[in-house]
Amino acid sequence: MRALDSYIFKMTQKPIFHKEFFAKMHMFKELEHVDVEDLSMLKLLGLPITKYNNYAFTLETLTTPIMQGKFCIVDIETNGSKPLLNQIIEIGAVMIENGKEVGEFSSLVKTDILPDSIEQLTGITLSELQHAPSLNSVLEGFRLFIKDAVFVAHNVNFDYYFISHNLEEAGFGPLLNRRLDTIDLARKCIEAPKYGLSSLTEHLGIAFENHHRALYDAKATAQVFFKALENIPEEVQSVEQLIAFTKPQNQRKKKEKTNRSTTTGTSL
């Protein structure tokens, strides 16, 4: 996890004074080319920041009810597993607002590199990719689509950090969105023999075609997300409570312990 992510997590624990917040944000290498004192820019990067009062900031997700939240269900296909060496070849996403699907994003990404194994897995051809939009244009479109919605995916860290790395390389700044893993959410809310996407959709009776195509996988993940929400505990009410509930218990305890032992500066 990035140090930047740990600091954003700190904002879920208590509001943070403006002066401390800006001073800290200036320290992160990922934000060295970002005007961190422009809140509209931070929101464009995905941070759901809002004013707590005239002196401090907090996160909108702390008070937004789940059914009024914005969730962007994302899936990517890549020509390899390493962001430093490989590239995204397709992005698919479904936007959920107020409990309903309200939009879709889908695009192939231009490249001249497509291993045979990836072509066989996805059905995407090299010719299709050679005539697709450039990576930078697709990333720009995706950033405008997701805005500050919660980034949701099945095995979320892979998709999140792959996209974030590519955004940074393109000069667009990193992702700062809150994120949620539907694998962890499903494990908390759905009894199933396996929790891979294809296994879950089969178990739940969700129609699932074109596995390993980004938009279709995102749509299937959205259906798993909706099914899981039917079984969340009554006390889980806000978007941030849902994110916290989703995390494995030992991970939550570790974060809470780290936050208590490393809190510095002046916070409300």
List each language-model region with its residue ranges.
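Ordered, small/hydrophobic-rich secondary-structure cores
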Residues: 1-23, 157-184
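N-terminal accessory regions of nucleic-acid-interacting proteins
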Residues: 1-69
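Acidic two-metal-ion nuclease catalytic site recognized across multiple nuclease folds
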Residues: 2-4, 11-16, 20, 52, ...
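Short, conserved glycine- and acidic-residue-centered signature motifs
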Residues: 35, 87, 214
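Conserved non-catalytic scaffold segment of RNase H-like nuclease domains
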Residues: 58-60, 69-164, 169, 176, ...
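Short, glycine/acidic-enriched loop or turn micro-motifs at the edges of active sites
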Residues: 78-80, 184, 220
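Short alpha-helix plus adjacent loop in nuclease-associated cores
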Residues: 179-197
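Acidic, divalent-metal-coordinating active-site segment for phosphoryl/phosphodiester hydrolysis
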Residues: 213-226
